[in-house]
């Protein structure tokens, strides 16, 4: 059968699979688009943009940042959570467009992106430490994220949180040379046992091993996580 005779939905599925699994998804999709009319139409489908593995195109960020951001915007418009996540951090950290950045991060979170939820929490807590009375609102938001389904929020288990933190830190390091500074170090807890190590964890090869610690409250738990994040970026 001639390829032009295949149903359009099958062509879209094939193209989306390439966008998802390819090591070089952008160049492969561009080549496919240029090959014939039927694939040009298939590559324009929203599903292809939604499935594009944009995290495999970081080299484009250094070679042609304008094109990289253009690809992210098109994919984010199609509902690609990773594209929304990276674009949100770019807007927030590099372009100082806080409202736009948070909007993209929220869009990613709504599509189940755990690192986006984590970053919204860290941003909220970071900002709250600059203003009296803001910490409680930030902590309520963080608890909302952590109590969400596993696909939509960061896990409160040590390993789950460390994994999400690594992902967030990795993107932050790739996107910007700017580093966050604590507006004000969190007030130490009066409980002498709060934050004490319960069980020692062997240091991971990447230096990101987390010990099991006991905290007296959700406030102290999140403040410790915030300090961990700042130290890593």
Predicted regions and their residues:
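CRL adaptor-proximal regions
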Residues: 1-5, 218-221, 230-233
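TPR/TPR-like (Sel1-like) alpha-helical repeat modules
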Residues: 109-110, 114, 130-151
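A conserved position within tetratricopeptide repeats
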Residues: 40, 76, 92, 109, ...
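Alpha-solenoid helical repeat scaffolds
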Residues: 85-87, 118-121, 135-136
